Regions:
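Short, surface-exposed coil-to-beta transition loops
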Residues: 56-60, 81-84, 155-160, 172, ...
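N-terminal leader/targeting segments and the immediate start of mature chains
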Residues: 2, 15-70, 132-133, 290-314, ...
Length: 340
């Protein structure tokens, strides 16, 4: 069926529901399933505010989707220009790119279907459809679902409210709550542009690394990426452990600091400061594990390790005793400079 005809039929069905009085929960769920099933492409912008740390983190997000599994998610954090990142999914896999540092990692992952993604249309609809106990209400402009979340590595954010625009059935607002029912994450969407025609290389790694998409120096870079002094950071979430040893090393690329914690749950944190930026685009590194959000950035998690980059520093957390949730908590607690 022609794409335009499909869109017209979907819009007609939405108007029919609206014209027959207040829509039921099952009516709206059925329409949501049909709408996302017929999507060929979309593009929109969103703002995501994360309130889980000591200070709120605000992201500007540019979202693009092309049927049936191509995604590009641009995440710009004004508080960390070098940390602005891109999540790509294409025929070659899932990638996390940090254009300012010429870094790219490839994951063997079923992202985004492996967990809730509060900024992705398909993921939000999947959460609604998969929760038989979801609560539903209708406001003047929105259909509102209150559902369980599916965060594999963070059980502290169990509930979300998703607001869908009544006219288009696209998401307008997402509120994610912690166990005390405080808003921990809030995502606000701009109107969606449907049926977008993208350039052939729009979802390719090299094109996104060298496009200057964040107005940052990417591609061929010479000299230092930062003039700031290397500051060793210490976690405040210690999980019953204490700092037992600090080791510092000089490397050709810069400095390395290794923090060893011993106690109830032992772990090690490595911090690598690279004084010289990479000089050319290189092939993506294959990263074990799955991509996860940790505060201001996206990291790679396995059962016994968590790696991430922030403010020009590469971090590696390793432990045989910490759970995945605990590793994320330790990593997030390193967001501020702390004394030993």
């Amino acid at each position: 069926m022609n794409r335009v005809v499909r869109v017209v039929l979907i819009l007609l069905s939405i108007f029919i529901i609206a014209g027959c009085g207040q829509a039921s929960q099952e009516d709206v769920k059925k329409e949501l399933e049909e709408v996302v099933g017929d999507l060929t492409s979309y593009q929109t912008k969103a703002k995501m505010e994360m309130l889980t740390g000591e200070t709120a983190q605000l992201y500007e997000i540019d979202l693009a989707y092309q049927s049936d599994h191509f995604y590009r998610v641009l995440m710009h954090n004004e508080g960390d220009e070098e940390g602005s990142q891109i999540i790509l999914k294409n025929d070659d896999g899932v990638f996390v790119l940090t254009p300012a540092l010429n870094k790219s990692f490839r994951f063997q992952s079923d992202w985004p279907s492996n967990a809730s993604q509060p900024y992705l249309y398909h993921s939000l609809v999947a959460d609604v459809l998969n929760d038989d106990q979801a609560e539903f209400k209708v406001t003047d402009q929105y259909y509102v679902f209150k559902t369980q979340t599916n965060y594999q590595h963070n059980k502290t954010l169990p509930i979300q409210e998703v607001y869908f625009d009544q006219d288009s059935l696209t998401p307008y607002l997402v509120k994610i709550y912690d166990a005390d029912h405080n808003v921990a994450v809030e995502v606000t969407f701009e109107p969606f542009e449907l049926g977008v025609e993208f350039e052939p290389n729009f979802f390719e790694v090299d094109a996104n690394l060298t496009s200057g998409i964040f107005s940052l120096p990417v591609g061929l870079i010479e000299g230092e990426h930062s003039q700031s002094e290397f500051i060793v950071r210490y976690p405040t979430a210690l999980m019953g452990a204490e700092l037992s040893e600090t080791a510092e090393f000089d490397r050709e690329e810069g400095k390395r600091v290794v923090l060893t914690y011993q106690g109830e749950k032992e772990f090690t944190i490595v911090q690598d400061y690279n004084e010289t930026a990479m000089v050319a685009v290189r092939e993506p590194e294959l990263s074990a594990g799955v991509p996860v959000h940790i505060g201001k950035t996206i990291g790679a998690m396995t059962d016994q390790s968590l790696t991430w980059s922030e403010n020009g520093v590469d971090y590696y957390l390793a432990s045989e005793q910490l759970t995945r949730e605990e590793m994320i908590e330790v990593a997030q607690s390193m967001g501020q400079q702390m004394e030993k």
